[in-house]
Amino acid sequence: MRSIVIIGCGYTGLRLGARWLAQGASVVGVAMRGASLDDISLAGITPVAWNLDAPPRDGNCAPVVDWDASIVYYCVPPPPAGSADPRLARCLAGVVGRPQRLVYLSTTGVYGDHGGGRVDEATTPAPRTPRAARRLAAETAINAWAQAQGVSWCVLRVAGIYGPERLPLERLRRGEPAIRPEEATPTNRIQVDDLVTACVAAGVSSRADRRIVNVCDGSDASSTEFLLRVARIAGLPAPPFVSRAAAQATLTASAWSFLGESRRVDNRRLTEELGVALAFHDLDVGIRASL
């Protein structure tokens, strides 16, 4: 029986845990909040509380699991400030033993802006936002820790995640504007169930050992095209259009950071080398499955 530990068992982690349970694995789900622990328990996953924002103390210790026998997934985002990831540092300090593999969920944001150009895993990261820089620092920390401990690792650079309860339906209902189609630039995304499939492959494939893997559907549709497709399929009004400059002037810095960069992310390592068959490479199919 495989042993799985999911640190940060939230939106993606719950689905990943369910997939592993269906394959007969034992699954531990780690979360920092009580409400999340309830969701983990309801999913049939063993819940464990671990506050990575606080130093170790009584009642806030690393999970008591057989780390040596486990595939460990780390899905916790870095804190919203700083240049490093103290949450990850506390986690790695609490791991006793040598997991079979450590899989870290990072972001394609580490590549920065390429003006719509194509990037793959050999592209030198050039993060433009503090959030992406913290992710890249975390990747470096994972690599250093794994090398020192002799642990297999895989970094998944994940594009924007959509799925059930993660479609912009309320935005469309509010009539919020989108960038004019002629000014909208390529973006990248992945349906959550395909992300789970990628996570499973990253945990077990020999071709994922000590590798970085991009996770996206390869569609490169702009944010505007995505909104238009969601509106059409969900039977909602299409959004009004504004210029790119007007959108930048009205959006928060955080929101604009997702639209101000453009790149086409190559996913051939995922689909050809790891052999992941994406169920939702067609956006329309993915959107319908997410409603």
For the regions a protein language model found, what residue spans apply to each?
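NAD(P)-cofactor binding segment of oxidoreductase domains
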Residues: 63-104, 140
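Glycine/proline-rich active-site loop of Rossmann-fold NAD(P)-dependent oxidoreductases
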Residues: 136, 149, 161-174, 201-213, ...
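Amphipathic terminal alpha-helices
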Residues: 281-291
